[in-house]
Amino acid sequence: MSPTPKNAVSPLDSGQTSPARHLSAESPPDLQEQFERLRERYQRCTTSLASAAHDLKTPLSIISGYVGVLQGEKLGALNDRQREVLGDMASSCKRLQNFIQDFLTYSVLETGEMQLRFEMGDLNESLAEVCSLWSPRFQEKGLALYFLANEKITPFPFDAPKVQRVISNLLDNACKFTPTGGTVWLHADPYMWDRRSTQPSSFPNDRRQRSLSAPNAIKVSVADTGPGIGPEFHLEVFDDFFRIPQKSSETDGTGLGLAIVRRFVSAFGGKVWVESDAGNGCKFSFLIPLAPSSPLDPSRGPKK
């Protein structure tokens, strides 16, 4: 699959911001008052969302634990029908746990409480770990998942758990929307990032850029053979709670997965974008600076 570079868009260059985030000091007093009310309401909603998610986490963990006990036949042998029902219950519990984790992560990002921990690590190992965790789900759906390790990537300081969360969200997105029989690729390459360019993927000679002997970033990409994303959604797809209109409701989600990706990558000091045409698959890429810059406040929207 080779997405069209001309349709690559980075939300970090679009001037996107979260609602109720910034207002000029020169704004009229009545507008400032409305802004403050809106911001307070937004903060209350975020707090309530986090509280509800946290309250659901414990009972759901208990239910999931009991389902695991039953599946292990520790309380007696199971017939085929019982195994099927318990399998459905386990899948439903997992989906709910993912929803709850998205809400909790989002609330942490909104309050600006997330902390980054940059430590020397092997990115190939981190990506391989994520692929191993996701491999069973891809196999269950009949999808091929390929990870292309790159020996040119040497250890560098990065926040491994959060990079893995970004990859997990991108793989989750690819798994949801790629039809059975499809293929998903994960790969990373050393990259020379020209920060003056608004479109990382539209460099005149991308292959030459990536082969330079002194890269300043790592480009990580997740590509799939799914239905793709029309250019009209390339910016909105990274918005909070946004979901692309679907003809069917076969896929579920919170609409936060890619928004969390955007927030994390922004906090790294990196850049994220999508390359896709409707009907021609999708490729999400993000850049991790090899030398971490001052971490950004992940609750803030990207600067214009």
Task: Tell what function each PLM region has.
Residues 107-118:
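Helix-loop junction within the histidine kinase core
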Residues 83, 117-122, 139, 144-154, ...:
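Conserved catalytic submotifs in the C-terminal HATPase_c
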Residues 211, 215, 229-241:
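Short conserved segment of the HATPase_c
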Residues 36-75:
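Primarily the dimerization/phosphotransfer
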Residues 91-96:
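Short alpha-helical segment of the dimerization/phosphotransfer core of two-component systems
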